[in-house]
Amino acid sequence: LNFTVGDIKSNTEKIIRAIDNAKSQGADLVAFAEFAVSGTPAYGLLTKTTFLELCEDAVERIAKKCRGIAAIVGTPYLTAEGPISAAAYISKRGEIEYIGKRYVTARREMGYIVGSSIGSQTISIEGNNLKVVVGDDISRMEELDESVDAVISVNARRYGKGIMTRRFDKM
């Protein structure tokens, strides 16, 4: 999906349509990119409390559509320390839990987001343990717990030849 910077309403509608489509095909989980709700690069918008609150409202709207399907939605999220890049894990019951990016590695992000979160979290869906990792935190993971069945990396990094191969090699 192609998300537009600052167009929370349109981005949310795209996400909801994709959730409805995945649900109609019997999917248990659907995942979206880092900053899917806000679009990226959002830079200066991430310093606006109103913008961050609108993103949180959008995640709540998306959660209402997640009855019977889980979703992982990339969004900025305002914490007590400041805005973070997060993945909103929305359960099949519509409950929201935010998983935040731990490291701010790109200079272009510095000053807009803080990196003080846990960085990754294991969730369980239909008996499968899935590790959800936000942003470039995947490049700092040394090893995975053997109980993890799959990794979902919510990342908005630009395409670069060989990047995926290097990431897999690190894991």
Where are these regions (language model features)?
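Enzyme catalytic cores with a strong preference for nitrogen-chemistry domains
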Residues: 1-171
